[in-house]
Amino acid sequence: MEQKFYICKHCGNIIAKVKDTGVPVICCGEPMSEIVPGTADAAVEKHVPVWTVENGIVHVKVGSVEHPMLPEHYIEWVSLQTKQGNQRKELHPGEKPEVCFALCEGDEVEAVYAYCNLHSLWKA
């Protein structure tokens, strides 16, 4: 199942759906909206994750041009989707927009997501 993320338009809560049973996800009394990757009007080269795998470690850099990591504009988290599941790492202003994930033997990367506090979700 492709990883899907949802946001509450009222409070800003974001969730990752683990299993889709067809029932809408509700927050603040209303259905949450699915976040569709890459739909914000922003620089692709600073938002799309760039990843490599070396010796079972997935190295992710956000953007082919490094994304800013300022308090007012930064990557909040990076999520890795694999054949066997998913992992997520949080980032904070002042840090480099880079993370690493370990893969178990036989697992493979399916997608990498990055969430920008201003420009929403991006996928590679």
Residue ranges and their predicted role:
Residues 21-32:
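Cysteine-rich micro-motifs
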Residues 117-124:
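Short acidic/polar inter-strand loop motif in beta-rich domains
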Residues 8-11, 27, 116:
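Short cysteine-rich clusters marking metal-coordination/redox-active sites
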Residues 5, 24, 113:
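Residues immediately within or flanking Cys/His clusters that coordinate Zn2+
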Residues 61-62, 98-105:
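Exposed aromatic-hydrophobic patches
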Residues 62-70:
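Short amphipathic, basic-aromatic surface patches that mediate peripheral association
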Residues 15, 31-32, 120:
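Cys/His-rich microdomains that often coordinate metals
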Residues 3, 19-22:
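Flanking scaffold residues of small Cys/His-coordinated metal-binding clusters
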